[in-house]
Amino acid sequence: MAGAQRVYKQRIRSTQTLKKMFRAMELIAASRITRAREHARAAAPYSRALTRAVSAVATHTQIDHPLTTDRADTNRVAMLVVTADRGQAGAYNTTILREAERLAAQLIEEGKEPQLYVTGRRGVGYYTFRHREIVKSWTGGSDNPEVSTAEEIADTLLEAFRAPVAEGGVSEIHLVYTRFASMVSQEPRVVRMLPLEVVEGVVEAGGDVLPLYEFEPSPEAVLDALLPRYIRSRVFNALLQASASELAARQRAMHTATENAEDLIRKYTRLANTARQAEITQEISEIVSGADAMAAS
């Protein structure tokens, strides 16, 4: 019985240590998520404005631009998968990787060849463990993305889209990320960025239709200037949305882990008390038996 009591006390101490760690991670995520949400909210108007500007060019002109035209000379397709650098975020990474696998299976079924571009150590580890080739990866700072990283990612994807077939050019660019809906809801999203599909931010509910523009020096020159910025803003916005989603998922997961640790501590405390009571009962029984034996002799 004494051995069982020691085991339960050791488990209580270990669980208390884990509880402190879970609680600290919950508080850290809670302190960072406010800033992450503000950054995502602040970046949204710029992304919408660029979408509207690009939409105006694509809608009111009849041009054959490489970034808006389907490419038929290759079946390679780029997939940018946005994951986290760390775990302890519930099903956050699992959900987005499952969505990426679904997209890859769909593309393969269509006769296309997915090319993986991955952000976050979790995604890199996932594909490396499965011996899946990654064209390029970016790690570090998934919970606090920087503009320079987004620009590097976007420029790499644009370079692949513009590259000839012999140099690994791709015909499409797809983005797989997690959209922050609320503190309790984060949604995996798949967006085809190139060739350009203007599917959001064109006309808001109750808003005005796109006005007519005259483009100087030409619509092609305007697209050349706008589309790289458009892709960079979409990538950066996706990184910000994923950052807020990661922190929200981590805060929720660590809160649940803290509560589970408290339940375990209560359980082990009861078991330790039961073992102690059994030990005391056994000692009393042995004393009484010894006294009876001495009295009988």
Curated annotation (Swiss-Prot):
Annotated Gene Ontology cellular components are: plasma membrane; proton-transporting ATP synthase complex
Q: By its UniProt entry, which Gene3D superfamilies does this protein fall under? A: 3.40.1380.10, ATP synthase, gamma subunit, helix hairpin domain (1.10.287.80)
Q: Where in the cell is it found?
A: Cell membrane
InterPro entries in alphabetical order: ATP_synth_F1_ATPase_gsu, ATP_synth_F1_gsu, ATP_synth_F1_gsu_CS
Query: How does the entry describe its membrane topology?
Result: Peripheral membrane protein
Q: What processes in GO biological process is this protein linked to?
A: proton motive force-driven plasma membrane ATP synthesis
What is a single molecular function from GO for this protein?
ATP binding
Please name the PROSITE patterns in this protein's record: ATPASE_GAMMA
Q: Which UniProt keywords apply?
A: ATP synthesis, Cell membrane, CF(1), Hydrogen ion transport, Ion transport, Membrane, Transport
Pfam assignment, any one:
ATP-synt
Description of how the protein assembles with itself and partners = F-type ATPases have 2 components, CF(1) - the catalytic core - and CF(0) - the membrane proton channel. CF(1) has five subunits: alpha(3), beta(3), gamma(1), delta(1), epsilon(1). CF(0) has three main subunits: a, b and c.
User: So what does this one do?
Assistant: Produces ATP from ADP in the presence of a proton gradient across the membrane. The gamma chain is believed to be important in regulating ATPase activity and the flow of protons through the CF(0) complex.
UniProt record similarity statement: Belongs to the ATPase gamma chain family.
PANTHER family assigned? ATP SYNTHASE GAMMA CHAIN (PTHR11693), ATP SYNTHASE SUBUNIT GAMMA, MITOCHONDRIAL (PTHR11693:SF22)
**Protein name, UniProt field:** ATP synthase gamma chain
Q: What is the lineage of its organism?
A: Bacteria, Bacillati, Actinomycetota, Actinomycetes, Micrococcales
